[in-house]
């Protein structure tokens, strides 16, 4: 290496070139992730990876953006506060109520004090536990496409891109949808509370169904009808994957609070 390689201008130039290269890859990857469902996964397994960010890199970056925006927009899709564990429509609600009640009595603290610590841990854990859903969903894909004779890693790549899109939907799509609903209500002077979480669930489910249908068709090369049928079942299965995630999150927070 020459002395020029250690100069400040050369160092800054390399840094700018690297950032520009990453920015270009991110832009291309996001564009295809949103507007060409299944394309990035198909390209990756074909070995065409140079022009796009690798699946894990893309997901990590979007994950960071999501949790930053979630704190600003007050989204709790993955953080799941204690209140939801105890009174939400969760399969483990009764167990959670019993465990929390016993711990509060043993510690001699109020529910408000315990809830504050629990939710703080939940925010921290959710940033890493979200990764649990990716391999679980990949296992479902392997079952649905067992005759395709694909490697598990191929399903995993598809799953990573799918959950990356889900985060993008939560970052951009859901806030815009909420704004549209509330804006329409204000336009017609509808003063009662019109927006509920059921609107969010419905919106996300419909978006994921259509996105997944197109992704499956592109990646697994099956008919539109077959892909749509499997998408419907997988979208429903996602509810149980989310319950599994929230159960793991609850136990992680409970035993560390």
Where are these regions (language model features)?
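Membrane-proximal intrinsically disordered regions of secretory-pathway and membrane-system proteins
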Residues: 1-257
